[in-house]
């Protein structure tokens, strides 16, 4: 599976990317919305993992842009923001799942498998 990870925290981005590579996935990792947008216009992904709090904006804007283009690529939000309003905004924006940091990497793998069904 080709996966785009959009995460500005180096420790989390490295852990998530390494875990997915170990599971046999191909991973591109971006730390901001600008780079993620460039990647999405040049390559097709099977899954996008996006943080809400990024240095150049909110991950919801990336999610909305993906959906506005009619792209059905599954998107999982992964964020430390655990307010009901954050979850609701993600779901209404078209996210397929929502993980609250810190999360177990095996839980991420399980949710990825569920989305692929």
Task: Give the role of each language-model region.
Residues 1-117:
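N-terminal/domain-start alpha-helical segments
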């Amino acid at each position: 599976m080709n996966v785009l990870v959009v995460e500005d925290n180096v420790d989390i981005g490295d852990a998530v990317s390494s875990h997915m590579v170990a599971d046999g996935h191909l991973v591109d990792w971006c730390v901001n919305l600008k780079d993620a947008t460039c990647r999405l216009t040049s390559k097709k992904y099977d899954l996008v993992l996006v943080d809400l709090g990024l240095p150049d904006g909110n991950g919801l804007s990336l999610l909305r842009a993906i959906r506005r283009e009619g792209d059905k690529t599954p998107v999982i939000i992964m964020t430390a923001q655990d307010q009901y309003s954050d979850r609701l905004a993600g779901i209404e924006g078209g996210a397929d799942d929502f993980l609250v940091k810190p999360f177990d990497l095996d839980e991420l793998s399980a949710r990825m498998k569920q989305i692929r069904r």
